């Protein structure tokens, strides 16, 4: 099957930004979004949906994307996730990512089935990270940025295995949650965490 291309993007005005997020499902850590404006004459080879790439290839591509593209990263905190829910926190992170580009896009393509509540021209694309190069590039940057953050958080909040599980609800993470209680970076609005929230970790 062919990978992502510019086929769905060429009908739109330039500059065009692709936007994607990483971290909707984990029990801990922020949700991170990236916005990428690619130079169509300088696209790194091998860009694909981040979920289809190995860690080494993804890290290499992230570096190459940052070298040749406009990149913006936006974060919604655990507190924001718990306050407004993960969907709207994801939208907020996307808004912040586009605002961080340093260039105002004429069009934004967003992975998923809805766009943030903004006034800029935009269109959502279901499965966009597998279809659109700009969105695929954003998926790589968002995933790399969030993984880096979770590895750093693992140093400061040891015991949960975040460097490995990235905050997802693996059996080992759930076991640690039961033993240690939630950390300040756990999403207390998520059911597996809420049941332990009466016993917050120090």
Swiss-Prot record:
Sorted alphabetically, the Gene Ontology BP terms of this entry are: DNA replication, removal of RNA primer; mismatch repair
Tell me its cofactors: Mn(2+); Mg(2+)
Tell me one GO molecular function of this protein: manganese ion binding
Location of the RNase H type-2 domain: 14-202
Q: Any keyword Mitochondrion? A: no
The cofactor note from the UniProt entry for this protein is:
Manganese or magnesium. Binds 1 divalent metal ion per monomer in the absence of substrate. May bind a second metal ion after substrate binding.
Q: Which domain of life is it from?
A: Bacteria
Chief place where the protein resides: cytoplasm
Reactions catalysed according to its record: Endonucleolytic cleavage to 5'-phosphomonoester
> What is any one of the record's Gene Ontology cellular component terms?
ribonuclease H2 complex
| Similarity field | Belongs to the RNase HII family.
Its biological purpose: Endonuclease that specifically degrades the RNA of RNA-DNA hybrids.
Protein name as annotated: Ribonuclease HII
Q: Which organism is it from?
A: Rhizorhabdus wittichii (strain DSM 6014 / CCUG 31198 / JCM 15750 / NBRC 105917 / EY 4224 / RW1)
């Amino acid at each position: 099957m062919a990978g992502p291309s510019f086929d769905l993007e060429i009908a739109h005005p330039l500059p065009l930004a692709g936007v994607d997020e990483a971290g909707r499902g984990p029990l801990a850590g922020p949700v991170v979004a990236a916005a990428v404006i690619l130079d169509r004459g300088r696209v790194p080879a091998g860009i694909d949906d981040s979920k289809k790439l190995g860690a080494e290839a993804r890290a290499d591509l992230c570096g190459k994307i940052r070298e040749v593209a406009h990149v913006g990263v936006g974060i919604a905190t655990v507190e924001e996730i718990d306050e407004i829910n993960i969907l709207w926190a994801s939208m907020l992170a996307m808004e912040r990512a586009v605002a961080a580009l340093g260039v105002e896009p004429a069009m934004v393509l967003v992975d998923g089935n809805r766009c943030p509540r903004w006034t800029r021209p935009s269109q959502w694309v279901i499965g966009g990270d597998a279809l659109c190069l700009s969105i695929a590039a954003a998926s790589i940057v968002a995933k790399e940025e969030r993984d880096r953050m979770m590895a750093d958080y693992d140093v400061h909040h040891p015991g949960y295995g975040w460097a490995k599980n990235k905050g997802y609800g693996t059996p080992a993470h759930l076991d640690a949650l039961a033993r240690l209680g939630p950390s300040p970076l756990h999403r207390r609005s998520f059911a597996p965490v809420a049941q332990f929230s009466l016993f917050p970790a120090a």
